[in-house]
Amino acid sequence: MKKKIVCAMMCVAMVATSLVGCGSKADDTATDNAGTETTDDAAGDDAAAADDAAANAGSGKVYYLNFKPEQAEAWQDLAASYTDQTGVEVVVETAASGTYEDTLKSEMAKSEAPTLFQVNGHVGLANWKDYCYDLSGTALYDQVKSDDFVLKDGDAVQGIAYVIETYGIIYNVKLMQEYCAMDGAVVASADEINSFDTLKAVADDIQAKKDELGVLGAFTSAGMDSSSDWRFKTHLANLPIYYEYKDKGIGSTDAIEGTYLDNYKQIWDLYITDSTCDKALLSSKTGEDAAAEFACGDAVFYQNGTWAYGDITADGLTDDDLGMLPIYIGAPGEENQGLCTGSENYWCVNKNASEEDIQSTLAFLEWVVTSDEGRDCLANTMGFTTPFKAFDEDVKYKAQNPLISAADGYVAAGKTSVAWCFTSMPSETWKNGVGSALTEYAQGTGDWDAVKTAFVDGWATEYAAANGQ
């Protein structure tokens, strides 16, 4: 009973709170460094850094429309600190999950439009390239390690990735160890899971032994409300797209064939069958529900990514509790597959803003990726792996968490990372169509043929609409 009460309190806290702000992380860093410099030295360094930031900040203002709700508090704290140091107003607004494109359209129509926004890749850039300032020649572009992390239109640099992320099936190490110690366990270690067939056998067995293991299900709820459905209509849907592209040697298409949709079906069936909740409840289940279920030990597996680290460790889970598996769908050769790694987060500066606001926005971005405070916040508070040179100058600015380590481990083992092909999805309307069909299939009000139709026919329709065909 005590365990259940504590767990309930943790889950409530998780839903009610977000990530720890940058101020707390800065305080920890100051404490850690206390043995190497005096308080006066630290204060002097901070004052000098503030003076430098103020000198370069410009006379405009910054309005950042943030894409990531899970980092909203951290961005607010970082913006407030920059304003304190420079006097430059930095406003951070965060779009609700799943609404970024609509929110951006609305905000761009206002007289006080965002000076800093983001696109998800080349498809997103196509909609907004007329708003994008050329970032070539800026201090931000000088910090990028490779043009692999930028979006170009001709020679113009119109977007710069600010985080490289990885997703897969996060698992609770301790629960897996407890399962593996049970009589008749399918595997002796999570390391033996290297295919869909093995994953399904393990998940089915955990589901059958859930009471003995003390969980509600093998997988967290596959919630299909707007705070969670992107995990399945976008991130999970990436797998059949990736394998089709891989077979054809392409990076985009005007007409997806759906070669691997049967594989998509079997992983989706596994998620919604070996679950913490009844399929009929999925339409109302949220991202917070899934995170809380995992953090409280109600499920062994949780599809999400490195960005979820702060949420699931905020209330009890430790680094030792976390591992990550590839998302196996039964594709040929998947035993050599790694995790899904890429970016859909590219900063763009609004070229229609005033020159003063543009320069202040560029100065803010330079400070974010080069200052001690900015780097600490991105790497350690937000948990980002970034493509910027300044983060390589000190190991403390390299994000260290077991989910990132898992990704590095698969690469070191020679596994092939799964590319983020979902950035080629033709539109948000296409994603929503697939999401609706998945939901109806899960709750028994639709069939899988409707998913295929939304996936294949919907792709052709939306691609043609997006490209004026």
Which ranges hold each PLM region?
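Glycine-centered hinge/linker elements that transmit conformational signals in sensory
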Residues: 203-204, 248-284
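Short, solvent-exposed loop/beta-turn-alpha elements that line the ligand-binding surface or hinge
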Residues: 136-149, 191-192, 223, 241-266, ...
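Extracytoplasmic/periplasmic solute-binding protein
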Residues: 156-162, 167, 197-253, 299
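Short, polar/charged alpha-helical segment
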Residues: 54, 69-89, 434
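Extracytoplasmic/periplasmic substrate-recognition and gating elements
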Residues: 110, 315-383
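C-terminal capping/gating helix-and-loop segments adjacent to ligand/active sites or protein-protein/ligand interfaces
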Residues: 405-461
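Hinge/lid segment of periplasmic solute-binding proteins
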Residues: 50, 55-56, 120-177, 231, ...
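Extracytoplasmic "Venus flytrap"/periplasmic binding protein-like
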Residues: 81-146, 158-159, 174-186, 293, ...
